[in-house]
């Protein structure tokens, strides 16, 4: 009976043959005390079948040591229920082997608590598969330590959806490496919020390809800081569509230096609003190509300030 099983001295548990353990039913497994479970040898643990493992209570599971858990096969680990995975201590989760982590189903991964995710180190984060990353909730993603963000494989980042991208904190976005950033597709980039975009450094933005830069929405372009706009590479500026160029704020245009102004194409100049044209620093007027000036309409010409007109060169 269950009472008889609980009466077995913990010191004698190791003497139980694996075939005898296998003969126990779920109710009998659950009847074992935590001290008895803790006394099981790794040989006994590795002999347990899926039904035996699934019979373990949360309290019983939590007494298993790192060596106990790591002695289990990936098939055994994959047999745990979502409730059991959810019940593991942060200390247990932190010391799981990569193979065990990868054996978790998407349902098991989604059952991980945010406290368990926080306990993961970079090796644990790096071990997760693309399918597992795609299954993570927004709360779980936000729980990843910023110091571990660089460990995420580019394929895993590519598996994330727009809502997941928007869930990242600015500190996490700031922790992305240039290799990770250059791997992002158009949908990933367009999912970034204004706050997330504004934490990208000059090197981050300049690491993006012109195709990636051209993928930003007009709202995202308008959200860039003046410092970010000021330090854009000429190729990125030229990659802007006319709609994106028209989305630039007057503060961003005012922050442009002569090299930035010179980088604008005739099509982009023709798309600028009168307010944007008036925002160009008079000191940068000389950098405007004659072909760009030729693309301007009458209304745009009339928008120039007298100081800007005075800055035009004779050529």
Regions found by a protein language model. Give the residues of each.
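General marker for long, soluble alpha-helical cores
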Residues: 1-315
């Amino acid at each position: 009976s269950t009472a008889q099983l609980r009466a077995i001295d913990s010191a004698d548990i190791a003497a139980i043959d694996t075939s005898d353990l296998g003969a126990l039913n779920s109710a009998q497994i659950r009847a074992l005390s935590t001290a008895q479970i803790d006394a099981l040898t790794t040989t006994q643990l590795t002999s347990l079948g899926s039904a035996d493992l699934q019979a373990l209570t949360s309290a019983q599971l939590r007494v298993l040591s790192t060596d106990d858990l790591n002695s289990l096969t990936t098939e055994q680990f994959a047999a745990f229920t979502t409730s059991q995975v959810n019940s593991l201590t942060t200390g247990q989760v932190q010391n799981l082997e990569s193979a065990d982590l990868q054996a978790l189903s998407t349902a098991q991964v989604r059952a991980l608590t945010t406290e368990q995710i926080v306990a993961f180190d970079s090796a644990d984060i790096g071990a997760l598969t693309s399918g597992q990353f795609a299954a993570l909730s927004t709360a779980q993603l936000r729980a990843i330590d910023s110091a571990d963000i660089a460990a995420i494989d580019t394929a895993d980042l590519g598996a994330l959806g727009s809502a997941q991208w928007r869930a990242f904190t600015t500190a996490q976005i700031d922790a992305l490496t240039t290799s990770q950033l250059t791997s992002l597709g158009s949908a990933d980039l367009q999912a970034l919020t204004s706050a997330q975009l504004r934490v990208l450094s000059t090197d981050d933005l300049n690491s993006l390809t012109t195709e990636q830069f051209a993928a930003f929405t007009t709202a995202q372009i308008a959200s860039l800081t003046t410092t970010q706009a000021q330090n854009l590479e000429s190729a990125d500026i030229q990659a802007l569509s006319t709609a994106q160029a028209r989305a630039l704020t007057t503060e961003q245009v005012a922050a442009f230096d002569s090299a930035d102004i010179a980088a604008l194409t005739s099509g982009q100049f023709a798309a600028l609003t009168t307010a944007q044209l008036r925002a160009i620093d008079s000191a940068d007027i000389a950098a405007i190509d004659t072909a760009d000036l030729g693309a301007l309409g009458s209304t745009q010409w009339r928008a120039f300030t007298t100081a800007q007109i005075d800055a035009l060169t004779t050529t």
